[in-house]
Amino acid sequence: MFKPHLLAVVSRCNSFFGCVDICCNWGNSAPRTLKGLKSVTSEQVFEREQKYGAHNYHHCSAYRAKGVSLDMEGKRYFDFLSAYSAVNQGHCHPKIVNTMVEQAQRLTLTSRAFYTDVLGEYEEFLTKLFNYDKVLPMNTGVEGGETACKIARCWAYMKKKVPENQAKIIFAENNFWGRTLSAISASTDPMSYDELRPYMPGFEIVKYNDTAALEKAFQDPNVCAYMVEPIQGEAGVVALDAGYLTEVRELCTKYNVLFIADEVQTGLARTGRMLAVDHEDVKPDLLILGKALSGGLYPVSAVLRDDHIMDCIQPGLHTAMDVMDPRMRILAASRYYVRVARERCENAQIQATYLRKELNTLPKDVVPVVRGKGLLNAIVINKKFDAWDVCLNLCKPTHGDIIRFATTGHHRGTDPRMCQYYQKYH
């Protein structure tokens, strides 16, 4: 069974709401008798998942994540992963948890055959917040991407008059928006798409951050949309050049192509603005949100767009079984989180400046590049070093409260000294 060296946890950047802990461990320490802890070790957790679960992840164990957190052995860790930006506000936010429990005790599930008192309230709040006419809620981030693609194709045939079965959607090289067949059909990572053919037709790739290549692709009159992440997280936190999104907006308008912004990871203040596209004050035709949208308690996504695009979706064409049920109450609660997120944008910028300043003190022969925006950041490890070996060195047992990392590839990470910073100021 795969077991990394002793113990390690986490990469990417932590919550902009301060230092919120998550309990994780790679190790085999004996269980401690602590109030509220199960009598089970991390080793037992690993073995059970290895035996009964699909082997699609190498991960840590976690028992509790709230405030000061504990793992199976009672160890405490700082969460610099934030569930890939799904828990920007921290784990188990009490207001959101309490609201969801309250709703679950009242009504848990209906279908779209019924109205509820929550959905319209949520839709009004979200559309007014981001200045769109309509929102289509879904369950997961990848469903948000799928929904945006379906809307784009409908718009292509109904409004742009693209010939039947000829609509094309352009994606940026090294994109990542999920693991469905549609998402992997847009991928350029062999680990995502190998041995899963045939792929979705009508998807084409252009180089990321290259407006000349994009304009050349737009010469094809059958191109109906361009989907892009303002910062490519899975590719290694790769940000676009300043001015790129402004040019994309201009090109999409010029060639009558829909601009789709995938803000599943970057949205809701992660980059220091409510949306990453806000750094250039551009408005996409379709906006995809997810992850932190629910406050980290439930898979929820949303696609926002204006009426002239929304009108292409007719009754029966697209829905989801569970997405409209009263669990939307959690989204009503998440309005509190979104409001706080707006207030915390400036705080994210302040913390990010400090973080990158400290990261830039790392040895340049090992870490030549530090990149990111707001509190979505990465370090690039020199290719002559093996990233795993570097992490093992970082993971050596230390005294005190130094963070230990878990990472793969030649990017991602953070600085142990951030522990001291957050202990001092939070």
Swiss-Prot record:
Keywords: Aminotransferase, Pyridoxal phosphate, Transferase. One of its GO terms (molecular function) is ornithine aminotransferase activity. One of its GO terms (biological process) is L-proline biosynthetic process. It comes from Vigna aconitifolia. Its cofactor is pyridoxal 5'-phosphate. Signal peptide: none annotated. It catalyses: a 2-oxocarboxylate + L-ornithine = L-glutamate 5-semialdehyde + an L-alpha-amino acid. InterPro entries: Aminotrans_3, Aminotrans_3_PPA_site, Class-III_PLP-dep_AT, Orn_aminotrans, PyrdxlP-dep_Trfase, PyrdxlP-dep_Trfase_major, PyrdxlP-dep_Trfase_small. This is Ornithine aminotransferase. NCBIfam families: Orn_aminotrans (TIGR01885). Gene3D superfamilies: Aspartate Aminotransferase, domain 1, Type I PLP-dependent aspartate aminotransferase-like (Major domain). Its EC number is 2.6.1.13. The keyword Oxidoreductase does not apply.
